[in-house]
Amino acid sequence: MMKTRRVVTGHNKDGRSVVKWDSALESKPGRDRFEKVDLWATDSLPARLTEDDPTQWNLGTSLANGSVFRLCRYEPGVAERWHRTDSLDY
């Protein structure tokens, strides 16, 4: 199982830089021999500043008017599935 450390920085009420989240994220199950980890998401463009962790949202392949930043790992021999969406992809 893929483990990823995610560090997200932001600003406090005084405008100083802070670490908002420093967490280990585990991959979510997908199809056979495929793993994914959601790193970040936005629900609008331009993106709004959020106080909640967007990886806890109900994320699909894409978000209407937003974006999903996802790390995907395919094991050797697995046929990838490319798709087309009207979305911002990282």
Tell where the protein language model's regions lie, with residue ranges.
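Short acidic, Pro/Gly- and aromatic-enriched capping/linker segments at domain boundaries
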Residues: 1-12
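A short glycine-rich, His/Asp/Glu-containing loop-to-beta-strand
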Residues: 16-90
